[in-house]
């Protein structure tokens, strides 16, 4: 019997016994096996088994005091226990999430973003912003060099992927959306393509703002809570609110998506994902001290529908124990439980509030906060086999092409010298070479800094002065 003729159940059993780092190599031996290993429902089931072996346990990525951890949370046990020590043991550190050679970003991480098993970590150091993408389950990381050094903390960051006709082929991308505008409603955002290791800049107009930094990734796209602003970017009284989606396939923002409620400027609205399949939104009413959580039944870049109210809680008993200005949360639909992370009113302790729709409430002290300005962040974590494409091969090919063009221009210079100073007519071919070199060196100035090493700056500037061709 040929490998391709084996039943799917047997193939799944075989692949599930293969070490994680060897799955791709094994799958490449057979087309059917490769198709199965790239099926996202199978990989989600496979990697879910490898990490979460205990029943009723869920995995989350949690950032506390600028450090990132993988946590296991047993909400079923929490709901049953009354003893504080047993409840605290139900929220366990699995491990420090990643180990990098440069500890700066681990000790100064301020933003985490999860998409399809990949994590985007962002940190600010004395040397500027640092970006790293990691698949903690495969132990793969990739540092990304920012296009500019003067990014701001208020900028929005996200990671997603471009969808192909073949669902197993995806191009991972990162979005950097700048808050500042240079002329009324004209804004700009940058997209980093993992395959080409390049940045693209886009300008657009908008009539909305994103009051909160943290978005949520679902099915490769990113969603934010947004409010309307006027034509000059100024806030208006009681503005309409809605969701806005960035589609990584079209590289455009979509239309407004309606919410099941209307919020005011003093209300708190936070987004979260449910197994990276549905969107959950939390609203805490400022004047009523009431918290509501809604969950979508369907969500796409241009369409959304909502389920009935998932949870509604009177927050008055929590006024003196918890602050809602900067919180994050995740839910368990099966247990009808929500976990809300934040700080106490003095900003000295990290707190987790476990709330059930049957009136259950329990507060867990996660320890002293060493950074009063860094609020806990949490997002559900779904391990995956997504490989992080490294930039080395792309850059190596780029160097080869660049060296070839540099050689062509130097040959042209040598030809000019042989004319003993007499005027020499530049050939069409030489002009093309110089034009290509100009463009590539300009690109490398920010990408890999090869311009100054390939051609001295004076030759770089003078070499094209005689050429009528403009880049």
Swiss-Prot record:
- Which Gene3D superfamilies does its entry note? 1.20.1280.50
Matches recorded under CDD domains: F-box_AtFBW1-like (cd22157)
Provide the coiled-coil residue spans. none
What PANTHER family has UniProt attached to this entry?
A: BNACNNG10540D PROTEIN, F-BOX DOMAIN-CONTAINING PROTEIN
Domain F-box per the UniProt entry, residue ranges: 1-46
Do you know which SUPFAM superfamilies this protein is assigned to? Answer: F-box domain
Q: Which protein, by its recorded name, is this?
A: Putative F-box protein At5g36200
Entry's Gene Ontology cellular component terms: plasmodesma
> Short name of one Pfam family for this protein?
FBA_1
